[in-house]
């Protein structure tokens, strides 16, 4: 299959998917296993291999996908763990984890971790989480945000929090069988969508039923209010961690993409969802 590349689009003959930030500018942050902006020249991830603990930045191949050839050249037959997930928005809101035991996995004994044929980051549900220490500058009128993410939540993970800070600031809580409507704290309440369809009157239990299906899903969350992620002592924006670092709430899931836009810069939700689905072939 031939590749056609221009400054605005990464194209594989027969299957064109424009990087989302090309069409929908001014994102707050973006993390992905694909290139989100055709003009982005940085890396996707920084990876530690677990034999000699050497680290390397891994970028993208000519079609805008994660460069798995470079990734496996770095890890060889060893496993690889995420030290840093680079923000492609231009705002430098990189997500990091320097504690080796808490780094999620991208290579398992020489094989790239994948879901639906594309690389994914695996959070083990025990001690894995990543941190964005500047909280993305959320405050006041700039705190209203839409969140889009691609993940595969596991049915065996019955109680977790996807995004959390400290001092009981968090959102997207799921618990199997729970009728509790406390799905966020100081964050909304957000409206949840699965694969473009709204989840009406969400509870912790219905979110578990919707997302924890052992299948890849696209989640869209609108009307988030993120100002308390930028209020002392909540100075961190964490993936798979909340409640002051309580390990009991860490998630067991694969994550491939995580995008944020502020309310003042929001693209049309359906357009973003269509772009994501065109690339990942979720539904």
Residue ranges and their predicted role:
Residues 1-13:
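Short, low-complexity N-terminal tether/leader segments at secretion or assembly junctions of large
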Residues 11-50:
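N-terminal module-boundary/linker segments of secreted carbohydrate-active enzymes
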Residues 13, 257-283:
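Extended recognition patches within non-cytosolic domains
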Residues 37-84:
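Low-complexity, highly charged intrinsically disordered N-terminal segments
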Residues 53-64, 132-133, 173-174, 193-203:
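Short amphipathic beta-strand/extended segments with alternating polar/hydrophobic composition
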């Amino acid at each position: 299959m031939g590749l056609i590349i221009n400054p605005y689009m990464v194209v594989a003959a027969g299957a064109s998917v424009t990087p989302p930030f090309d069409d929908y500018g001014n994102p707050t942050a973006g993390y992905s296993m694909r290139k989100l902006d055709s003009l982005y020249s940085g890396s996707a991830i920084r990876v530690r291999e677990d034999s000699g603990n050497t680290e390397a930045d891994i970028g993208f191949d000519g079609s805008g996908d994660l460069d798995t050839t470079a990734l496996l050249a770095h890890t060889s037959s060893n496993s690889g763990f995420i030290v840093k997930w680079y923000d492609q928005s231009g705002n430098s809101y990189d997500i990091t984890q320097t504690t080796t035991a808490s780094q999620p996995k991208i290579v398992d004994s020489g094989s790239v971790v994948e879901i639906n044929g594309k690389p994914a980051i695996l959070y083990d549900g025990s001690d894995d989480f990543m941190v964005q220490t500047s909280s993305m500058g959320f405050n006041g009128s700039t705190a209203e945000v839409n969140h889009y993410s691609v993940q595969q939540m596991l049915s065996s993970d019955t109680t977790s929090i996807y995004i959390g800070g400290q001092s009981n600031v968090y959102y997207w809580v799921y618990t199997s069988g729970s009728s509790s409507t406390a799905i966020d704290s100081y964050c909304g309440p957000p409206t949840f969508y699965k694969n473009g369809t709204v989840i009406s009157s969400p509870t912790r239990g219905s979110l578990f039923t919707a997302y924890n299906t052992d299948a890849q899903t696209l989640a869209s969350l609108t009307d988030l209010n993120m100002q308390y992620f930028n209020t002392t002592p909540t100075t961190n924006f964490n993936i798979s961690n909340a409640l002051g670092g309580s390990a009991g709430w860490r998630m067991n899931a694969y994550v491939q993409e995580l995008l944020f836009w502020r309310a003042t810069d929001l693209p049309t939700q359906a357009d973003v969802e269509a772009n994501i689905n065109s690339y990942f072939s979720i539904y």
